[in-house]
Amino acid sequence: MKVILKEDVKGLGKKESLVEVSDGYARNFLIPKGLAVEATAANINIMQTKKEAEKNRKERELAQAKELAEKLKGIVVTLKAKAGENGKLFGSMTSKDVSDYLKKQHNLDIDKKKISLPESMKSLGTYEAEVKLYPGVSAKLTVKIEQE
């Protein structure tokens, strides 16, 4: 009997794959536990429609990430902070500060977890930050910290 897996099944296959199993295994284990459905023409069409929709969604997300990366190119994030005489900050600047700046100044909503800073920014100066927007798509930002 051919079935379509609804979840990954160890030793059998990945989610949404079409596999051939014995009738008893399908009727007594896979289908009752909700791990698979019988591979009828309607179910195969539903599976293909879902795969197509997922593919379109990923393409759309990739296009949006590339567009956002273009917008981020050339942006210099200038943050003001209180610092001591030797240029050492009272505290430090984080990816949240960079994210807040981009939201306020450029109306770009970027999650702070996507911004990776090379080192902790604890003194005045210029730093390079990388924004990971999508697997394989990232943008570089220049972060300047100036005396308040």
UniProtKB/Swiss-Prot annotation:
Domain of life: Bacteria
GO biological process: translation
Alphabetized UniProt keyword annotations: Ribonucleoprotein, Ribosomal protein, RNA-binding, rRNA-binding
Any Pfam family hit: Ribosomal_L9_N
Classification via InterPro entries: Ribosomal_bL9, Ribosomal_bL9/RNase_H1_N, Ribosomal_bL9_bac/chp, Ribosomal_bL9_C, Ribosomal_bL9_C_sf, Ribosomal_bL9_N, Ribosomal_bL9_N_sf
Gene Ontology terms for molecular function: rRNA binding; structural constituent of ribosome
A GO CC annotation given for this chain: ribosome
Family: Belongs to the bacterial ribosomal protein bL9 family.
PANTHER family: 50S RIBOSOMAL PROTEIN L9
Annotated function: Binds to the 23S rRNA.
HAMAP family in UniProt: Ribosomal_bL9
Protein name: Large ribosomal subunit protein bL9
Lineage per the UniProt record: Bacteria, Bacillati, Bacillota, Clostridia, Eubacteriales
